[in-house]
Amino acid sequence: PLRLVGSEMCIRDRLTSGGDAPGMNAAIRAVVRSAIFYGCEAYGIYGGYQGLINGDIKRLRSQDVSNIIQRGGTILKSARSTEFRTEEGRAKAAAKLAEHKIDALVVIGGDGSFSGARLLIQEHDIPVVGIPGTIDNDLYGTDSTIGYDTAVNTAVEAVDKIKDTASAHNRLFFVEVMGRDAGFIALRVAIATGAEAVLVPEIDTDITDLEHFLEKDYDPKQSSGIVIVAEGDKAGGAYNVAQKVGEAHPEYDIRVSVLGHMQRGGSPSAFDRVLASQLGVAAVDALMDDQKSIMVGIMNKEIVHVPFNKTIKNSKGLNPELLNLVKILSNR
């Protein structure tokens, strides 16, 4: 990213690392075009940190990011790199930046991507600004991450379809959504689809309590039911929970649906496109102001700068009011 040309700073590089999220292309577009707006050059690193180590770097012009704002995935591709986790790997990455006369970096990703960026800063003093891009919405210091809104809408659309077939047969469906360590997707999907219950990693699941709740709320002869399960739920995911409930209640007609990677794909929502555009420009602005080792986020509709140390070390908790909302609205 940044190169000194006379008295001007020029943004030079950006990469997407870790899991992809809808809206990353909109963020890439915003970084490239805002850099060009300031009279700077923009480069893309293909394949995340491993691509940086390999020197897979290409200049991006305005036309290169035309017609990508509506596309899911990332034109820069994304990958996890075990080599970058070593000091030798990071030294190679820093050498490639120096070789291409790159002075700063914009990283779009989650806490793993930012942890790698922080090490690059500590060991090689390279300015890095992060843009939160993860469907999990689990990054401290921002109300929403790029991709979260789209993932929720994708899951809601799928669950609505599942509810149709569940209703036709009076079935109880356990629907698993993404969320290995966080239940933000599960919680919002549960509220939006009128689910009977939601199981999230942040709260230990008591199967007996769930069974008692379903006994009151679900009549297999007269109604259907939906339970939303985050993949990281401590009871072991939707299949394990469904099996345990089924053993206790063989009269239930139980089915399981795992939504999986469909939640990462698809055209980003309008909300994610706007958010990505805002944060992409904010990242360039931060580098132009000599900021480094920060994530740009949005809190209460305002752009904020959050130190990497803070967003990596702190956890973002679920809203207890929303958890209570599921309980209140599930009563029949």
PLM regions and their residue ranges:
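Single conserved hydrophobic/aromatic residue that forms the stacking wall/gate
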Residues: 1-11
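Glycine-rich oxoanion-binding loops at beta->alpha junctions
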Residues: 7, 52-107, 113, 146-153, ...
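A glycine- and small-aliphatic-rich helix-loop capping segment at beta-alpha/alpha-beta transitions
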Residues: 29-38, 58-64, 119-130, 146-150, ...
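C-terminal non-catalytic interaction/assembly regions of soluble proteins
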Residues: 244-332
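Anionic-ligand anchoring segments at beta-strand to alpha-helix junctions in alpha/beta enzyme folds, i.e.
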Residues: 29-56, 67-74, 253
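Accessory alpha-helical/coil subdomains and C-terminal extensions
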Residues: 42, 107-109, 115, 119, ...
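Short glycine-rich or small-residue beta-strand-to-loop segments that form or flank ligand, phosphate
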Residues: 12-19, 74-79, 103-107, 173-176, ...
